[in-house]
Amino acid sequence: EAGKNIIGGIETTVENRQLVIRNTNSCNWVRNYNKPINVYIYIPKIWKIFYKSSGNITSLNTMKTDSLKLEAWGGCGRIELDLDLHNGFFYLQQGTADIHLSGNCGVASMHSNDFGLLDARNLQSGYVFISNKSSNDCYVHVKQGLNATIQSIGNIYYTGNPKDIQTTINGPGSVIHF
């Protein structure tokens, strides 16, 4: 969904069994951004999202699947996902993208490596394995076990009452219950 002169420059292809969405429009500096470009994807299951963009990703409904891997590389938008998972892998590798997660997850593996926000305080997870190498803070909700590693100035804030908490601190950041 986009303006009539824009829609033709939005390309969708499948490469190596992956859906790739590209905006090939030029002269973007003269465009009117009052009407955003929206791409709607309806699929029964998804197992990986590779994000390298300036746009936003939002799940309109709860995404229910066994496992999901989300990798953000060089993006600067906002990712909002409502999830029902057994295993979740969430990696904020580069850029300033913000990741906001909600729902339920059995085991969550998370890594923040750059300036973006990793906010999973609304994702109720049984076990969380998280590493923060960022200057930004991370937020998680954990019920059973937390394994947290700090490698920079960013903190890891957790809510819930995990029975087992393991921390490795190699930087000025802290692991803080809130």
How would you describe each model-predicted region?
Residues 1-32, 36-50, 58-62, 178:
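Short linear S-[DN]-x-LW-Φ motif typified by the pepsin-like aspartic protease active-site region
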Residues 39-40, 46-178:
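Extended, compositionally simple hydrophobic/Ser/Thr-rich segments
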